[in-house]
Amino acid sequence: MRKLRITICCILAFSIVEAQNGFSIIGVDKEVNPYQYTVQKRGEFKQAAVSSAHPLASMVGAVVMKKGGNAFDAAIATQLVLAVVYPNAGNIGGGGFLLGRKVNGDLIGIDYREAAPEKANRDMYLDKNGNPQMNLSLAGHLASGIPGTVAGLFATMPYAKLSFENLIQPAIDIASKGYVLTEKEAGSLNSVRESITKNSTQPTALVRATKWKVGDTLVQKELAATLTLIQKEGARGFYDGKTAELIVAEMQRGGGIISLADLKNYTAKLRNPISFNYRGHEIISFAPPSSGGILIAQMMKMVEKYPMSKYGFQSTKSVQLMIEAERRAYADRAEFMGDPDFFKVPVKTLMSDAYLTQRMSDYNPDKAGVSATVKAGIIKESEETTHLSIVDPAGNMVSVTTTLNNSYGNRTVVGGAGFMLNNEMDDFSVKPGVPNMYGAIGGEANSIQPGKRMLSSMTPTLVLKDKKPYITIGTPGGTTIPTSVYQALINVIDFNM
């Protein structure tokens, strides 16, 4: 088997061993020690690898595969641990997208993006004069969409091999036993303590009387209890019963609008992934309500006919060409992309060779364009996010991007449940033409409607070369996610990096 080259932080690889003694893997004398660990930023491995934003999450994912799990098992366990050790983006109170490819070639797309509550309306963040009140969609209870992560984890289970009870146990153990904070983690928690205190109505383990410092142990008993309830009752342990009641009680204390019915009615959805070819590579990414797949397809296909490798890495010609493709793709994003269950997204047209040739027809290599003058094409009728990449020994590939939107979401911890809520409502077009927190401008396609999923920039992506696993990639970064993935793929494929 060819070696797996991975350059995203926090990786671990291994030889496969048989499962022994269940999943008691957390402790000073166990496979994963939450009180002493190191970060590994890059490496080459023969068997398999897990890449995530935190070493403990990656280590757990690796041990899961050692004990007989596949890439999907590892993805579930890794996400759950991130919900404990990476509270600024790992979550059970947010949402995301999972893109997978089974060894037999089957593609899997699981959409567990947050959705607007039933009481949401398109003008909910406007004042009486029709002006946006952006603070309402950024922090506090009204900023939250219906969480989708837990539903997404259970939607992944049909592709896994191990029991959910085992896969969630490491996260429960780390939450209840605690983990040691690094200097960066302590500083991150301290930087948001005032905001969390302001927006949460109950005490939380993330905020204490004195500031956090390196070497402190963060124990989250309430979060452990919430995870244990999910372990015992499945998705119902989150969307119905005690946890759901705690979420709604928190909403009511802070003026939020998520209801018990919103939670009970939420479902993850299967989506057909987007696939296209670029210089002999098959690239697979996510479809709407993620804009990422269409965007990287547009941008890469717009530059494909140009000799990028001849231009050279970071040359004036290559940089200008890539930027002009980005301008055109993002103009289309604002006009044509939204939740496909509410708005007909012209996916085939947006990715067609004829349309993209027309989009680049006014490209002038001797003159830079101006973003303000770039409009959407004409189509005829007919710190804040986290990513994990996993490849297992059999060749299954999983790419997952999940988020609370802003770092630490809406800065509200659910009282009695111990987890942070998202502020994904800001990803809707609060008002057509008005940018969100990342500067993205949207139109009617992404307006607020009850039950609708807000347009996302998350871009979990897989690449095959000679029909074999080659790259699994994704990144945080808001609306810069698609351009980051696009540039990274160009760097690897065109510039042999």
Where are these regions (language model features)?
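M16/insulysin-pitrilysin zinc metalloprotease superfamily fold
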Residues: 293-309, 463-471, 478-497
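Bacterial Sec-dependent N-terminal signal peptides
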Residues: 1-24
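Noncatalytic scaffold domains of N-terminal-nucleophile
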Residues: 21-59, 63, 71-72, 76-234, ...
